[in-house]
Amino acid sequence: MERQGEVRISQCMIVKDEEENIRKALSWGKGIVWEQIVVDTGSRDRTVQIAESMGAKVYHYTWSDDFSAAKNYAISKARGEWIAFLDADETFAPGDGEKLPGILRQLESTKAEGIAAGWMQLDEEGRVSAAGTQIRIFRNRANLGYRRRIHEQLGRMDGTPMHIADATGELSILHSGYRGAAWEEKKVNGRNLNLILKELEDHPGDYEMMGYLGDEYYAAGDLDKAESWYRES
């Protein structure tokens, strides 16, 4: 039974082989969100079974080398008023998830379409190795969605700026994905590099993406190519 004044939040994520993370990723939303939507892009482990056992709505999506396409598919399945789109290797800082409904209630009558939250990258010892802001909570509206195959950007489909509320002092997202075996696998199979190259084929004037390409070559130890792309960007 829906409670009066309840803010309906759809927690969304896209996953593949995330059995080590999916339980924690879904746990923060229990008792907070209205529905949990998991879009699986081809898991070979127990990700789907675990998500289903926790009550999530699981959908299957054929991977098309495009993170934005998969995320927009997940959004299309959401029925809540707001969407919280965190990755499977992300969660809110302790106690922050519980603040979310109250923050959204305060924004209900405003023009805010999205919320800027703090974002922290954790190393293998759980220490903060990088920090910034991310827009992961936004209204469920047809004119909002993601673009780019990788390093996705949320925005209005017509390209005009979103109205963003600042909640960086109240909400922080913790990310643990760029470390350990999972990160080494991404580097070895070149997934990120290949997707960036495809994105630049489609959008050769994307200077920000050129910078990301420089980052990939730098991480791979190819300093000459890294410098070349940094200069281009």
Annotate each predicted stretch with a short phrase:
Residues 3-11, 80:
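Mobile, glycine- and charge-enriched loop segments
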Residues 7, 68-75, 92-228:
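Catalytic-site signature of metal-activated, phosphate-bearing donor transferases
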Residues 13-35:
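Short, well-formed alpha-helical segments that are part of the catalytic scaffolds
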Residues 23, 62, 80:
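Active-site-proximal cofactor/substrate-binding loop regions of enzyme domains
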Residues 28, 40-52, 63, 87:
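A conserved acidic beta->alpha catalytic loop
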Residues 34, 48-73, 77:
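Conserved donor nucleotide-binding strand/loop of the catalytic core
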Residues 83:
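Short aromatic/hydrophobic "clamp" motif used to bind/position activated sugar donors
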